[in-house]
UniProtKB/Swiss-Prot annotation:
Pfam families: Ribosomal_L12, Ribosomal_L12_N. The gene is rplL. It comes from Allorhizobium ampelinum (strain ATCC BAA-846 / DSM 112012 / S4). The keyword Cell division does not apply. One of its GO terms (cellular component) is cytosolic large ribosomal subunit. Keywords: Ribonucleoprotein, Ribosomal protein. InterPro entries: Ribosomal_bL12 (IPR000206), Ribosomal_bL12_C (IPR013823), Ribosomal_bL12_C/ClpS-like (IPR014719), Ribosomal_bL12_oligo (IPR008932), Ribosomal_bL12_oligo_N_sf (IPR036235). Belongs to the bacterial ribosomal protein bL12 family. The keyword Ribosomal protein applies. Gene3D superfamilies: 3.30.1390.10, Single helix bin. This is Large ribosomal subunit protein bL12. GO terms for molecular function: mRNA binding; structural constituent of ribosome. GO terms for biological process: translation.
Amino acid sequence: MADLAKIVEDLSSLTVLEAAELSKLLEEKWGVSAAAPVAVAAAGGGAAAVVEEEKTEFDVILTDAGANKINVIKEVRAITGLGLKEAKDLVEGAPKAVKEAVSKAEAADLKKKLEDAGAKVDVK
């Protein structure tokens, strides 16, 4: 155990250049390459990316107000708590985010409310 502690202490005192040189020497001595662990890490990263694709937060985007713009403005005001002018500007400036970073269930509920008012909505 004392030998391992000494090795750890010696390795901790190396400069970056010395550590890189040590790495090359060990690769030659043991006949291995540092590139192999990188490839394994990259493959593992692909699996993690698949898990990340299942989103937990969604943005509700108003793409078009449709023919019933007044009803859509009323619904946007109810959802966001914005004033009349701000809600009108948001609706007329479509496509714009009505609400961001909401749960999947809330995003679906907001989409239904806005579509019932006559708007076209995307959830991203």
